[in-house]
C-alpha cells in the first residue's frame, strides 16, 4: 500500500511541475508587441503560414481622441481573440486577417466602437463624422501563435 501512495504522490508532483512550466511558457514567452497608428492597415499574419486561428492576443488597447480632444481607451483583447478563433472551423483557414475584412479600412477613430462616444447614436450625420476626420487612433498589444 505504501508503494502505491508514493507512486501517486510522485505522479501528482510531476503533473504539478508540468502545469507550472506550461503556465510560465504561455504567459512569459513568445509574445511579440505590435502597434498600429491612424492610417495603418491593421493586418495580423502568422510567421509560418499556419492558421490564423492559432493566434492569440493580450493587453490590446485601442486608444483614440474625440473631436473635443478627449482621450478614450478600450480593451479590445477579447474582440481580437474572437476574430482569430472565428477561423477555427474554416475549411481553408487563412494565415492572416485584416481588420475591416475585405474593405481594408485604415485604423481610425471608428475601428472599434465605444458606446456613447463614437457609435451610430452619437455620430448621426455626415457633418458629425467629418469632425472625427483628424482624430488620432492607436492599437497596441501583444500577439503570439499557440
Swiss-Prot record:
Main location: host cell
UniProt topology in membrane: Single-pass membrane protein
Listed transmembrane segments: 7-27
Subcellular location: Host membrane; Virion
Keywords: Host membrane, Late protein, Membrane, Transmembrane, Transmembrane helix, Virion
Inducers of expression: Expressed in the late phase of the viral replicative cycle.
Any one GO cellular component localisation term in the record: virion component
UniProt keyword 4Fe-4S, yes or no: no
Family of this protein: Belongs to the asfivirus E146L family.
Protein name: Uncharacterized protein E146L
Amino acid at each position: 500500500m505504501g508503494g502505491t501512495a508514493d507512486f501517486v504522490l510522485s505522479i501528482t508532483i510531476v503533473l504539478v511541475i508540468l502545469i507550472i512550466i506550461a503556465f510560465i511558457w504561455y504567459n512569459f514567452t513568445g509574445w511579440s508587441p505590435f502597434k498600429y497608428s491612424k492610417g495603418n492597415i491593421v493586418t495580423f499574419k502568422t510567421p509560418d503560414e499556419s492558421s490564423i486561428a492559432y493566434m492569440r492576443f493580450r493587453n490590446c488597447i485601442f486608444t483614440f481622441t474625440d473631436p473635443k480632444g478627449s482621450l478614450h481607451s478600450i480593451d479590445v483583447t477579447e474582440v481580437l481573440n474572437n476574430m482569430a478563433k472565428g477561423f477555427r472551423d474554416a475549411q481553408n483557414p487563412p494565415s492572416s486577417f485584416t481588420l475591416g475584412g475585405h474593405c481594408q479600412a485604415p485604423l481610425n477613430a471608428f475601428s472599434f466602437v465605444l458606446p456613447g462616444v463614437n457609435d451610430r447614436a452619437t455620430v448621426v450625420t455626415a457633418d458629425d463624422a467629418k469632425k472625427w476626420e483628424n482624430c488620432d487612433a492607436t492599437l497596441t498589444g501583444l500577439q503570439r501563435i499557440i
